Design a protein with these regions (language model features):
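Membrane-proximal intracellular helices of multi-pass ion channels
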Residues: 1-172
Length: 172
């Protein structure tokens, strides 16, 4: 494929920033996969609200995005999507690292994490073996198939993908 630069020559600090940006994904309405920035904003606001309520237990603070109040069921749904996404990232990273190790491929956790984020968020090249100077061809077939599932999950939105996998969706 085409590559504009080799991430291996970049500093670890820059790669850490890129890894964090991979989590950020796109804005609402964009065609990017992964978690949208609005969900991260709500998640951070929930943490702030909960910390405030720990200090002031009797306080009631509604969630606001701009000038609009966000209802609690919506906040709860966003938190479920964030948690599900993070579980997929952790599980995907573990699966990719273990499966690569099983066949003798030396894949670091950061490479497995970037590979997971790349396919789940439809982002672009990852780091190291799954980076611009590498590719996915060296990965074992089960890993490639799993990454295909992660790619579909990220593109369709995580919850939509999981709903389609439930038996009750197909039976009635």
């Amino acid at each position: 494929g085409y590559a504009s630069t080799d991430f291996a020559v970049w500093s670890e600090e820059i790669l850490a920033v890129l890894l964090l940006l991979m989590f950020a994904s796109g804005c609402v309405g964009s065609t990017s996969g992964g978690l949208k920035l609005m969900r991260w904003i709500v998640g951070v606001k929930v943490i702030g609200r909960e910390l405030f309520q720990m200090i002031h237990p009797s306080s009631v603070r509604p969630m606001w995005l701009g000038r609009r109040a966000v209802k609690e069921p919506v906040v709860r749904g966003i938190l479920i999507v964030i948690l599900t996404y993070l579980l997929l990232v952790v599980g995907g990273t573990g699966f990719i690292a273990v499966d690569a190790h099983r066949v003798g491929i030396d894949l670091s956790i950061s490479e497995a994490l970037s590979g997971t984020l790349v396919v789940l968020g439809n982002i672009g090249p990852g780091f190291g073996a799954v980076g611009p100077m590498g590719g996915f061809e060296a990965l074992p077939v089960p890993t490639k198939l799993f990454m295909c599932l992660l790619m579909v999950a990220g593109r369709l939105e995580v919850m939509t993908f999981l709903v389609v996998l439930t038996p009750s969706y197909w039976t009635g």
